[in-house]
From Swiss-Prot:
Residues 93-133, 189-201, 250-797, 843-871, 925-941 are cytoplasmic. Keywords: Antiport, Calcium, Calcium transport, Calmodulin-binding, Cell membrane, Glycoprotein, Ion transport, Membrane, Metal-binding, Phosphoprotein, Repeat, Signal, Sodium, Sodium transport, Transmembrane, Transmembrane helix, Transport. Ca(2+) 2 binds at E417, D478, D479, D531, D532. One of its GO terms (cellular component) is nucleoplasm. Alpha- repeats lie at residues 138-178, 839-875. Mediates the exchange of one Ca(2+) ion against three to four Na(+) ions across the cell membrane, and thereby contributes to the regulation of cytoplasmic Ca(2+) levels and Ca(2+)-dependent cellular processes. Contributes to Ca(2+) transport during excitation-contraction coupling in muscle. In a first phase, voltage-gated channels mediate the rapid increase of cytoplasmic Ca(2+) levels due to release of Ca(2+) stores from the endoplasmic reticulum. SLC8A1 mediates the export of Ca(2+) from the cell during the next phase, so that cytoplasmic Ca(2+) levels rapidly return to baseline. The chain crosses the membrane at residues 72-92, 134-154, 168-188, 202-222, 229-249, 798-818, 822-842, 872-892, 904-924, 942-962. It is found in: Cell membrane. Glycans are attached at N41, N157. This is Sodium/calcium exchanger 1. Pfam families: Calx-beta (PF03160), Na_Ca_ex (PF01699), Na_Ca_ex_C (PF16494). It comes from Cavia porcellus (Guinea pig). InterPro entries: CaCA (IPR051171), CalX-like_sf (IPR038081), Calx_beta (IPR003644), DnaJ_domain (IPR001623), Na_Ca_Ex (IPR004836), Na_Ca_Ex_C-exten (IPR032452), NaCa_exhngr1 (IPR002987), NaCa_Exmemb (IPR004837). The cytoplasmic Calx-beta domains bind the regulatory Ca(2+). The first Calx-beta domain can bind up to four Ca(2+) ions. The second domain can bind another two Ca(2+) ions that are essential for calcium-regulated ion exchange.
Amino acid sequence: MLRLSLSPTYSLGFHLLAMMTLLISHVDHITAETEMVEEGNETGECTGSYYCKKGVILPIWEPQDPSFGDKIARATVYFVAMVYMFLGVSIIADRFMSSIEVITSQEKEITIKKPNGETTKTTVRIWNETVSNLTLMALGSSAPEILLSVIEVCGHNFTAGDLGPSTIVGSAAFNMFIIIALCVYVVPDGETRKIKHLRVFFVTAAWSIFAYTWLYIILSVISPGVVEVWEGLLTFFFFPICVVFAWVADRRLLFYKYVYKRYRAGKQRGMIIEHEGDRPSSKTEIEMDGKVVNSHVENFLDGALVLEVDERDQDDEEARREMARILKELKQKHPEKEIEQLIELANYQVLSQQQKSRAFYRIQATRLMTGAGNILKRHAADQARKAVSMHEVNTEVAENDPVSKIFFEQGTYQCLENCGTVALTIIRRGGDLTNTVFVDFRTEDGTANAGSDYEFTEGTVVFKPGETQKEIRVGIIDDDIFEEDENFLVHLSNVKVSSEASEDGILEANHISTLACLGSPSTATVTIFDDDHAGIFTFEEPVTHVSESIGIMEVKVLRTSGARGNVIVPYKTIEGTARGGGEDFEDTCGELEFQNDEIVKTISVKVIDDEEYEKNKTFFLEIGEPRLVEMSEKKALLLNELGGFTITGKHLYGQPVLRKVHARDHPIPSTVITIADEYDDKQPLTSKEEEERRIAELGRPILGEHTKLEVIIEESYEFKSTVDKLIKKTNLALVVGTNSWREQFIEAITVSAGEDDDDDECGEEKLPSCFDYVMHFLTVFWKVLFAFVPPTEYWNGWACFIVSILMIGLLTAFIGDLASHFGCTIGLKDSVTAVVFVALGTSVPDTFASKVAATQDQYADASIGNVTGSNAVNVFLGIGVAWSIAAIYHAANGEQFKVSPGTLAFSVTLFTIFAFINVGVLLYRRRPEIGGELGGPRTAKLLTSCLFVLLWLLYIFFSSLEAYCHIKGF
């Protein structure tokens, strides 16, 4: 289970913080100090008030002056209610972030037309990543703080309050110090995480510090204590200016304006990735939404000057090899697992390694906290089940098909010339088996002729009720003439149906199309092999492709143009680019022995499966000269079979006869007789002997056209298909989004297991822990309530976006009232309550999200890179919008919008100083001795984390002292 595991230093710090805050808040009451310090706070209030004001929604809890016991009870109720509201905000923010992920994941398809006329299609995201991070993503993660500031101003007659602005500053401090400290510490020892888009980080960090500096300027320098309309509006308009600057830095549009960019296919899912290069050819054209755009058009695709997709990009190959390696390792590690479990494991590993947005980590953290389970594991399991189910699709004709299909069992048949007849099987499948079905058949000449090679045959086959198979026979004519292999055709036609209800067996032809029809194949090809020759031996084709996962490869050796006699055919494997000896295949050699009338033999070769993603290696299988096993002495003489001989003591045609010696381990168990060259006196043969020699030569077994088969070993088709599916980048909008209300309600009432320390066993189904059940029952009310929010499928996520932000605003109003009443009950000022409790509550989901991102992501951008941008957006939106509305309202009434600069200005200044220290330390950590902003050696991690926690504690400490006038403010 994912938990916010803090070191003893963190735990001690939080305990000291709680004690310190309460101590400071009661110092004035204990010493009965009531003096006013003008410099500390213009309102003259240096102590917390026990007098509560009516909230935006919640009324005052009467009486106003309860007993000490009632105060404790009220404070407990307010605190528990506030925590419960924070849980609700986290859950509705989960829906909100899901809608943002769906919105920012929208893509469009573009077509690239190359100079050679080829076209390539790829997809590009409509939203730029940096723009989405600074707008919708930041709004989603900081919506409670922003809305709290706006609601507080609007709900209190457009007067400035301490809760909203202090929450924004306090949340910024928590994000900048505590979240980054945690991210630095949780990275495993020795590992580092660096910010990938450093220039974007510089821009957002600069704007973040400027935002808080700007607050000090407008509060204490330009118009002390008064916020004018132009100041409020300019604060708000800094938001789009900040976004534009970050976008410019991301797209390199200023300094890099004349550096031409090239886009290549990304590692996953065909997404385009930018890199710099030379000026490309101007002939490349890009078609988007049906419009052709020349490759030199500026500002295309977020400022790109060129789009060029390399279909064989090296990164794609690396991604596939990496995925193949993952699958091989999983198979070796879990040989007992089924394919579904292996695909689930691989899916989860791919999803875990895939780069994710800030929104995803926020959603993942919230669901893990609330017992909703790991969305990556659930999605991986769903995808695995779908993949397996696709393999199990039944392609056979359904038995309940209302139409009967009539067809041959197979499309080709073979027979020997001396077989007499050849049998062909006709199949009836589907339809009403109680009907009688008639089908005509007829032979047709091919290279074989009716009357000389086969008997012309035609007729009608009758399938009686219940019959599903019939056999027809065609006569084959034998002769003693050497012939090539010949073939003829048999056609099916004219299907008719007769039902039991028909009278006198009359055929019902009116409903033939709906009752029965011809299936495939409806024509069979019959090949007649000549049996008057010993045979021509050949492979079926010169080249064959096999999958490396085939195991044992079987290759057919055909015997055509005759099948008389027993023949031996030697064979052997020959290395090519594929190596034998068990590396790519096992060396094989031997002999095939064809019996009389046997026309097919198979050679078996073992292929080694080493599970390479792309494989194209070759070896050869070769057959040698065939030879007859049994041969008469005279035929052996006439064929002049040469070899090693021993003297037999016999004479033939006046010549000594020798026995041939075969150089084989297992000689043929027969005697082959011939005459040695040295005994051949070149005596001419008679005409009769010449004729006998010619006839013997005609019947001799010979090699055919394909004697050397090239075997190309390719990657496993199933393995490659699995890899191709896995390397396609899963759109995370599909993972976090929902398609229906039914799906949302099922998720709301389902308890799922959270994260485990052992991710290697993620394929095993685990039961929810006790913590999962506790968090589920604590949050089930919110889950069911917010299941009514429209699914992200509607309006491309905008329906969910609008409803969610309204719900967040409503809950934020409750949180503001509860926090204010909690503070006044125990005597805390709103500024202190906001900086400590409210800021902490609104930042907990971000803390979990950053922790997950720091441990799982390859870079530090998702964990800390967005912190600075989020801090700037909080000021420009949260304070800019609220103060602009209030300033305009007061200006319209001829009044001034007054804001006390004391506490806020002091907090802002303190935060700015500490933020400079924070950013400086992070940049220093990029030096080679540490290697990155996050992680590194254990000592460096611990020192950095302790420093950042100390900065936060000092910020809280000094802000509280200033709020209670113990130190001089501005």
